[in-house]
Each structure stands twice: as structure tokens, then as C-alpha cells.
Amino acid sequence: MLAWLLNMLKEEFSLSEVADILGVSKETLRRWDTAGKLVSQRNDENNYRFYKKEQLKNFEQAQFLFKSQWPDETKISNNVYTVLELFAGAGGMALGLEKAGLKSVLLNEIDSHACKTLRKNRPEWNVVEGDVSQVDFTPYRNTVDVLAGGFPCQAFSYAGKKLGFEDTRGTLFFEFARAAKEINPKVLLAENVRGLLNHDAGRTLETIKNIITDLGYTLFEPRVLKAIFYKVPQKRERLIIVAVRNDLADGIDYEWPSSYNKILTLKDALKKGELYDSDVPESEGQKYPKRKAEILSMVPPGGYWRDLPEDIQKEYMLKSFYLGGGKTGMARRLSWDEPSLTLTCAPAQKQTERCHPEETRPLTVREYARIQTFPDEWVFEGPMSAKYKQIGNAVPVNLSFAVGKSVVHLLDKINKR
């Protein structure tokens, strides 16, 4: 609470902070400065650009940040609600929903390593391992408040017609919809990649929305949430879908979670401070081959392949050097003063490099976990590659918590009627 209050008093923001808040590049801000669209101030000591809070208030994203109601919205409800989750992975969504006050009755996951992770950390959870299509959900009919899950984005076969529930058979969304049909929960909560918005020219999402409506639910318009606004030190975006059963929907409005009032950085993730009460613990991590380490040692914090000498650029990029485009993920070293880039299933892939800001090495398993806001005591099972994959695929815990609290508020409204 004290940190939140201090953040509310902040009156000046750096170039990188404003870039993150507004969702534009630092180069775009420099162009706006030159054009007079958003003129920066200059620090007398180092001549660095900064911006006054008053300058940002006309921007919608900044208003969202400055109007934070985080402490009020994250108060724990006295009511106990239940959740059944599909595609649970390593528990990012489950842990966030648990923090929000939702009690798990079943989690389904097909990956054996992820199931071991769930059982290791929460022996009391009912973890059902295996293909979701083989799970019978009818025993849970009318006993579950929330059905949650992040079904993978898959195309449907249209053949020139509007699709119904049965037409999506064979996809993982069908299994989510089948679970909804069998369980009849009060609320549906689904998450997916931002790309679902435009997948198959928008038809995939339109079909999902239509089927949710056909199942007897009132859908609130899906929204892309930026994790950096929800106390997650990572530039990650997720599409969130929320719907309430028709017989409960009359006069009910869903309020999306408001932002935390500060953009947290990689330093907040890995060092003692506002997010964690200690530095990140040591853990296993991938290693670079000798030549790759030599090349990445030349990249400054926040830099990438264009910061290398031209001959080294050509050596590292090979044919990609001549293809043009930014390719800003290649030979990328993270910065302490910015949120991490989106984590992938491995930290040392050439297209999506995630090099430590000071040491020339990939991020470790525990560093990965902190960036996804898992607690240090959350243990991941399996070989190192499986641990990275579980963490990289997870929903950030704090994002799930924020959404979970908003769903709990929705259920509270339903209960009060």
C-alpha cells in the first residue's frame, strides 16, 4: 500500500517509462518531440529526456495508469467461489485465481511435467492429467462458479457457412465449449494470444463469440490486456474473454480491472524491492556457445544486433542482414530500466534472444519465473527445457490475479441480487 501511495505522487517519467505507458517506441517519442506533439523536458545534470505527469494526461493509456484503483479492487472478498480450469499448464492462471479468492475444484492438463509441477506445489488440487476430450465434466454440473482456460488458437473449417458448436469439433475450443455445456457455470473466463483478434481475418474470434452466445451466455466484448499495467514486469499481451450466464446477466455489468499505478521493470523482477523482498535466487540456466557469448558481450543493455560492429552484424545475422526490417529480438540484451520483452519457451532462441542485462548469459529458470510473477517457492518439475517451456507458456500470475479479482467482483454482484 505504501509503494502504491508513493507511486501516485510521482510527477516525472523517463523516456523509456513513457514509451511503455503509451505503447510506442522511444524513437517515436523522439519524433514526437521534434514535431512538437509531445515535447520532453531535459534533465539539467545529464540532459536526458523526461516528461511531466501533466503532459501525459491527454493520453488514454496514461489516464488508465493514473486512475488506478488497485488497492480497492484487490481486496479479498468474504465469499468463496469455485473454478474449474482447462489447459492449466504450470499454474500461472490457477495461482492468480487462487490469490483472488477462487477455489479450484479441478485442473486439466495434458503435459506430464506441468502436471507434476501442479501436484508438487498444491498436493490438495485435483489435477486430472490427460487429453481434455476424454474428461467427463457432467459430475460438476451446476456446482462450479467459473470455467477458466486458455485454449490454443486454432483455425476452423468454414466451407462458407456460419459455424455452430458441433462444427468446431476436433478443436480445443470445442472442448472448452463442451465443458461449458456440461458444467453450466455462472461465468466463463478464457485467455488467448493477442493474435486471436485477427486470426483468419477475425473469423476465428467471431465464431468463438457466436458459440459462447449460442451456449446461453452474455459476452462482454473481449479485450487485450497489457501485463505491464497489472504489476507484471514484462511486455506481454493477452486477449481476455469474459461471459456470464444469461439467467444471471440482467442488469449485470463486468468491470475490467484497473491498472496498477506503476510500470515495473526487470530490476523490480530480479532485485529486492517493490515486487519481491529479496534478490532472485540462483538457479539453473542455459549457456551460450563460446562465439555467441563473445558477440553478445558487445551488446549494451537494451541493445540488439544493430549495436554491433558492422562486420560482426554480418557474421551473426548471415542472410538476414540483407533482408531489412528491425528484427529487434536478435542479439537482444535486456535493460534493467524497462520491463522484460515477452518471454518465449526458451531464452536463447536466435529470433527472440533474452540476454541478461549485465552478465552475458540467457535468463535462468528462476529469473524467468520472476518475470512471470511466480513466487520463488513455486517449484517447476522436469528437465530444464521443460521448465522454461512451462514458464514461457504461463499466464503471468499477477495478471491472472487482477482478472480474477474482477471476476470475483462480478460474482459478488450476482450474489447480491
From Swiss-Prot:
Single GO molecular function: DNA binding
Pfam families: DNA_methylase (PF00145), MerR (PF00376)
Keyword annotations from UniProtKB, A to Z: DNA-binding, Methyltransferase, Restriction system, S-adenosyl-L-methionine, Transferase
Active site: C153
Enzyme Commission numbers on file: 2.1.1.37
Catalysed reactions, semicolon-separated: a 2'-deoxycytidine in DNA + S-adenosyl-L-methionine = a 5-methyl-2'-deoxycytidine in DNA + S-adenosyl-L-homocysteine + H(+)
InterPro entries xrefs: C5-Methyltransferase, C5_DNA_meth_AS, C5_MeTfrase, C5_meth_CS, DNA-bd_dom_put_sf, MerR-type_HTH_dom, SAM-dependent_MTases_sf
Role this protein plays: A methylase that recognizes the double-stranded sequence 5'-GGNCC-3', methylates C-? on both strands, and protects the DNA from cleavage by both the Eco47I and Eco47II endonucleases.
Family, similarity comment: Belongs to the class I-like SAM-binding methyltransferase superfamily. C5-methyltransferase family.
Protein name, per record: Type II methyltransferase M.Eco47II
Organism: Escherichia coli
Gene responsible for this protein: eco47IIM
